[in-house]
């Protein structure tokens, strides 16, 4: 079955261009030029991935991302005409999984869409060579890969697809340090550059907050300075 992609961008030429490229890849596309018109589609929940522009005429793209994250965990890719690092960090903080800066090459967006859907539907990190069980646990933390559920002391923890994937990689390698380069390659399936470190840092911070693990001596995700992270 074809995945359903939601596009919300008030720049009609960009939205139309993305629609053409996505349909050429056999995706089902729901395209809107403002957030208001897209609300019924969003509320239906029948979406596999959303592409949101930050600057919309009727709603801030960040606010829309936050609204979606209250109910849904499907991947969100933000489009921005700005290049400030703060925009990227803000989007990731509110639950976005990736961002693309305008102007962009349509094929780059398609590649990112495929990567996000691949990770969301079926995750298999590249740095893990042995078969990993469907359920992983450490102390009071439990991660079920098949149901995409995270439990902390028996209570559900809502994670974005990227947060789930990062935690999966680290938990699958419990006791060992996972370098930032390995983590980036495993989760994003892309080459690591030093500028990507802030992306990892933001997601790790969110994970710690959701796991109530923000003390100076974290119980779960530990930072090994200059190397990476471990559980």
Language model: regions and residue ranges:
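Positively charged, aromatic-enriched patches within helix-turn-helix-type DNA-binding elements
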Residues: 149-219, 224-227
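Hydrophobic residue at a beta-alpha junction
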Residues: 32-33, 56-59, 86
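Short, Lys/Arg-enriched segments at the junction into DNA-binding effector domains
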Residues: 4, 115-164, 168-177, 181
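Charged docking surfaces used in two-component/phosphorelay signaling
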Residues: 16-24
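Basic, amphipathic DNA-recognition helix from helix-turn-helix-like DNA-binding domains
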Residues: 60, 66, 70, 75-137
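His-Asp phosphorelay/catalytic-motif detector in bacterial-type signaling
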Residues: 46-48, 71-76, 193-194
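Short hydrophobic/Thr-rich beta-strand motif most characteristic of the beta2 strand and flanking loop
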Residues: 26-34, 41
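Active-site beta3 strand of CheY-like receiver
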Residues: 46-51, 56
């Amino acid at each position: 079955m074809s995945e359903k992609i939601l596009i919300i961008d008030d720049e009609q030429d960009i939205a139309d261009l993305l629609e053409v490229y996505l349909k050429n890849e056999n995706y089902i596309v729901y395209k809107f030029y403002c957030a208001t018109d897209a609300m019924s589609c969003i509320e239906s929940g029948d979406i596999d991935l959303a592409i949101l522009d930050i600057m919309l005429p009727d709603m801030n793209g960040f606010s829309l991302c936050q609204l979606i994250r209250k109910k849904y965990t499907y991947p969100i890719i933000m489009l921005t005409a700005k290049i400030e690092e703060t925009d990227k960090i803000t989007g990731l903080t509110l639950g976005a999984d990736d961002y693309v800066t305008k102007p962009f090459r349509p094929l780059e967006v398609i590649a990112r869409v495929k990567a996000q859907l691949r990770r969301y539907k079926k995750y298999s990190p590249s740095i893990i060579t042995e078969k990993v069980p469907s359920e992983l646990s450490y102390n009071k933390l439990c991660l079920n890969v098949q149901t995409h559920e995270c439990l902390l002391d028996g209570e559900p923890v809502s994670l974005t697809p990227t947060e789930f994937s990062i935690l999966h990689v680290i938990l699958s390698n419990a006791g060992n340090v996972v370098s930032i380069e390995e983590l980036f390659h495993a989760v994003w399936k892309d080459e690591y550059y030093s500028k990507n470190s802030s992306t990892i840092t933001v997601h790790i911070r969110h994970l710690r907050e959701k796991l109530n693990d923000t003390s100076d001596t974290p119980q779960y995700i530990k930072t090994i300075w200059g190397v990476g992270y471990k559980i």
